[in-house]
Amino acid sequence: MLFILAVIALLITFILVPILIPTLKRMKFGQSIREEGPQSHMKKTGTPTMGGLTFLISIIITSIIAIFFVDNSNPIILLLFVTIGFGLIGFIDDYIIVVKKNNQGLTSKQKFLAQIAIAVVFFLLSDVFHLVEFSTNLNIPFTNISIPLSFAYVIFIVFWQVGFSNAVNLTDGLDGLATGLSIIGFTMYAIMSFVLDSPAIGAFCIIMIFALLGFLPYNLNPAKVFMGDTGSLALGGIFATISIMLNQELSLLLIGLVFVIETASVMLQVASYKLTKKRIFKMSPIHHHFELSGWGEWKVVTVFWTAGLISGLIGLWIGVH
């Protein structure tokens, strides 16, 4: 059944993207590029965005099919809720930017409050209504230490889901970068899920992998379409949710290490400039620093993919031991 789900997810995305691209162009749903960014990116102005709709539709359709064939499919239902919730926030943000011609999109406060609402509902569905059972203890790898958080765990969930949804969003600045890293990350979690006897989560990860594989050829440099906030916010929220449901939260710090580094580079850059009026990097997120240092876009992407693969394998090893 997993093979059938994988094929369905792959085909839906692969078929939808070439249909959506001319539609987005006709509707003038093109990406605007920051003038202060690398000059090589200016040629990307007008590239269709909101392409994340294609793999989100694929994930939703294929997951609904999976619910009827996978034993104990409650985890898939919960992951679908997170997918739709964070995807909807991203879609509204993209819509305001592209259609309303407001480059700010949703305000930080609006986006943050919406993300918090989804995280809280996720906690209620899982812990209070017992849609899915998981521990509210935070396990420390390689130790017998388990920190009981009880209802404070909802604060952790908010921090984790909001943090990683925005981390993937920050990383999605080069053609294929976030898509490739996500494929690597979900592959690690697919393996971990089956090893830890969580086949429903594993099935969802398989769906994620193949839905993204259908999108990747169109997103590689030179990208024919960008996933937009529609895709990136959803991917980050899903990563955080899977790590929570497997009770392997801290594994995401390694499986999603590149996302963490990208986010840290932005935070350090902002803090440094506010405190010293000096910048640590030529530009943040850090992938732009390497571009401005003379690296080609494809080189940055492949090096970051490699780093993500290595750290992901380490995170997988820690997660299953």
Curated annotation (Swiss-Prot):
GO terms for biological process: cell division; cell wall organization; peptidoglycan biosynthetic process; regulation of cell shape. Its cofactor is Mg(2+). Signal peptide: none annotated. It holds the Pfam family Glycos_transf_4. The chain crosses the membrane at residues 1-21, 50-70, 76-96, 112-132, 140-160, 176-196, 200-220, 225-245, 250-270, 300-320. It comes from the Bacteria. The gene is mraY. CDD domains: GT_MraY. It catalyses: UDP-N-acetyl-alpha-D-muramoyl-L-alanyl-gamma-D-glutamyl-L-lysyl-D-alanyl-D-alanine + di-trans,octa-cis-undecaprenyl phosphate = Mur2Ac(oyl-L-Ala-gamma-D-Glu-L-Lys-D-Ala-D-Ala)-di-trans,octa-cis-undecaprenyl diphosphate + UMP. It is a multi-pass membrane protein. It is found in: Cell membrane. Pathway: Cell wall biogenesis; peptidoglycan biosynthesis. Keywords: Cell cycle, Cell division, Cell membrane, Cell shape, Cell wall biogenesis/degradation, Magnesium, Membrane, Metal-binding, Peptidoglycan synthesis, Transferase, Transmembrane, Transmembrane helix. Belongs to the glycosyltransferase 4 family. MraY subfamily. Its main location: membrane. It is an enzyme of class 2 (transferase). HAMAP family: MraY. Catalyzes the initial step of the lipid cycle reactions in the biosynthesis of the cell wall peptidoglycan: transfers peptidoglycan precursor phospho-MurNAc-pentapeptide from UDP-MurNAc-pentapeptide onto the lipid carrier undecaprenyl phosphate, yielding undecaprenyl-pyrophosphoryl-MurNAc-pentapeptide, known as lipid I. GO terms for cellular component: plasma membrane. This is Phospho-N-acetylmuramoyl-pentapeptide-transferase. PANTHER family: PHOSPHO-N-ACETYLMURAMOYL-PENTAPEPTIDE-TRANSFERASE (PTHR22926), PHOSPHO-N-ACETYLMURAMOYL-PENTAPEPTIDE-TRANSFERASE HOMOLOG (PTHR22926:SF5). Its EC number is 2.7.8.13. GO terms for molecular function: metal ion binding; phospho-N-acetylmuramoyl-pentapeptide-transferase activity.
